[in-house]
Amino acid sequence: MCMVIFAPLFAIFAFATCGGYSGGLRLSVDCVNKTESNLSIDIAFAYPFRLHQVTFEVPTCEGKERQKLALVGDSSSSAEFFVTVAVFAFLYSLAATVVYIFFQNKYRENNRGPLIDFIVTVVFSFLWLVGSSAWAKGLSDVKVATDPKEVLLLMSACKQPSNKCMAVHSPVMSSLNTSVVFGFLNFILWAGNIWFVFKETGWHSSGQRYLSDPMEKHSSSYNQGGYNQDSYGSSGGYSQQASLGPTSDEFGQQPSGPTSFNNQI
């Protein structure tokens, strides 16, 4: 039930916080010649974080000449892979929820439904682990590439001590951090569901039968041995009791002694 409730929600949060991100930073370059300064240089970037395609112009503080620069790095592969896994996990979890609720009988026919569900769950657990780890590394690269201090080092005007370069504001990465957290939460959720899905498959039931058969054979042989022992003991006890008492012939011969003695007298 937890899988049915939380899997679609966690998947939505994962791809929404990553795929819907857009941010930016603002820098300022204050030249010695104030007319050449630019105190508001906006640099915007967004998903899928092809930072090398993000270009911007900055003053050189050498006349009216301007310098065209671009951010460094490309984290699009890890970001797109992460979002793709999240979208497909969301779609599959929705389909699985519908099957669990409305088609429970067909789901259990011929063990095909639980078997497919088990395989898909294992695959998505692996994909969530790989995708979340790759995106965590990609996010780290994005943070470095969009750090205002790193961007200022790209500007030739900022290499001159007479010019003043500073960051007005840095990009906000809270939603991207949240996407990584939800990525690993999805991995924990899907990996934890492997055991519960495995219990629905025929592999688990066949394993239970394999373990129970030797125990049943052992218990049946034990009961059979106990029965033979009881029967042997009962027969032995009966014959032993029969031999303890005097026989009917002995009871019949006891009065014959005194009778013959009286006749002789």
Curated annotation (Swiss-Prot):
Central nervous system. It comes from Rattus norvegicus. Glycans are attached at N33, N38, N177. The keyword Transcription regulation does not apply. Residues 1-202 form the MARVEL domain. This is Synaptoporin. InterPro entries: Marvel, Synaptophysin/porin. It comes from the Eukaryota. Residues 210-242 are annotated as: 5 X approximate repeats.
